[in-house]
Regions:
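Long, charge-rich boundary regions
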Residues: 177-255
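Acidic, Ser/Thr- and proline-rich intrinsically disordered linker/docking segments
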Residues: 259-303
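Cys/His-rich short segments
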Residues: 138-191
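ATP/pyrophosphate-binding catalytic subdomain of soluble kinases
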Residues: 119-122, 126-142, 146-151
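Soluble catalytic domains of membrane acyltransferases
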Residues: 1-116, 132-133, 140, 155-156, ...
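General beta-strand recognition
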Residues: 94, 170, 249, 270-272
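Phosphoinositide-dependent membrane-docking surfaces
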Residues: 14, 241-270
Length: 303
């Protein structure tokens, strides 16, 4: 399927985890050649069903491209194919044009104004949409993969103890359980009924933990690999991944937090880093562990 889509649409490849000027230049070249470009402004799909921040660079690109900007929002996609999940679910997906902005209008706007307009046009809250217009989304084993989004148990505060199996979510540490319904909600004893609210709660709770002296995220069985220009990887280190406010390290390899420029997640749970020299790394894990908690911690440090 991937090869078919590439051959049909000839997409512009974008490197995750940092700014990719080659992708920007490729977009500008195609626009100036009269081609249309579909750009997903967030740069990734979300884990919680809420449109994330729009990078300021996207606004800069829109203003300098000299092309008409059409904003289009897609609804239902989060429940049809949640980023954290496996497979597709049958349900309603819809789209709507929100705005059309000619080049002259964009030239008269600042980057901040364009970014704000993009945020307004593209904002969607999947859980809120379900409350207004409930739609069932049915599929096989719909709770599988929830641990990619949910890394902290609200009952026992254990990290990486949650597991989604079939249509159920449970904590391997305290035994708490819930059922994931066709409407994308949780019914059970966790005290959280919406993935959106759980994701926000765990990030806020992580921020409180980070205020404690000596707090660090740790995971054993991690392999650090450097990603080459040809996308091949070279193993750099293996051991326990450790991230605190000052460093991220594994084995004999360490990177000061000031030199960490970007943290991203590839697909569902592959952690990607970009340093100040533009070097890119990824982490492979020999067990279930969350990449999102490291991304959250990095963003909280940089706030």
């Amino acid at each position: 399927l991937r090869r078919l889509l590439v051959s049909l649409h000839n997409p512009v490849a974008l490197r995750k985890g940092g700014t990719d000027m080659r992708a920007v230049l490729a977009i500008l070249q195609r626009l100036r050649a009269g081609q249309n470009i579909c750009l997903f402004a967030e740069g990734h799909t979300c884990f919680d069903g809420v449109t994330g921040p729009i990078p300021r660079g996207t606004a800069t690109l829109a203003r300098s491209a000299g092309a008409t900007l059409v904003t289009y929002v897609v609804g239902g996609g989060y429940f049809t194919a949640p980023r954290w999940g496996r497979g597709f679910r049958r349900g309603r997906t819809w789209g709507e044009v929100k705005g059309i902005y000619p080049p002259e209008q964009l030239k008269a706007m600042t980057d901040a104004e364009i970014a704000a307009q993009l945020a307004r046009d593209l904002h969607i809250d999947a859980a809120q949409e379900q409350q207004v217009n409930p739609v069932p989304y049915r599929g096989r084993r719909p709770a599988e993969g929830l641990e990619n989004a949910l890394y902290l148990c609200p009952r026992c505060l254990s990290f990486d103890s949650l597991r989604g199996e079939d249509n159920r979510l449970h904590c391997t540490a305290c035994g708490t359980q819930a059922v994931y319904t066709p409407y994308g909600a949780l019914e059970g004893d966790f005290g959280q009924s919406q993935i959106r609210d759980w994701v926000a709660w765990q990030r806020q709770t992580l921020a409180g933990m980070m205020a404690e002296e000596g707090f660090a995220l740790k995971d054993e069985g991690q392999t650090l690999r450097q990603v080459q220009e040809d996308h091949k990887v070279r193993e750099v280190a293996h051991g326990t991944l450790h991230m605190d406010r000052r460093h991220i390290r594994i084995g004999d390899w360490a990177l000061p937090m000031d030199s960490l420029r970007g943290v991203a997640i590839f697909r569902k749970n592959r952690l990607l880093l970009t340093d100040s020299n533009g070097e890119r790394y990824d982490f492979a894990s020999d067990h279930v562990r969350s990449a999102l908690k490291y991304k959250d911690m990095f963003e909280l440090i940089k706030e």
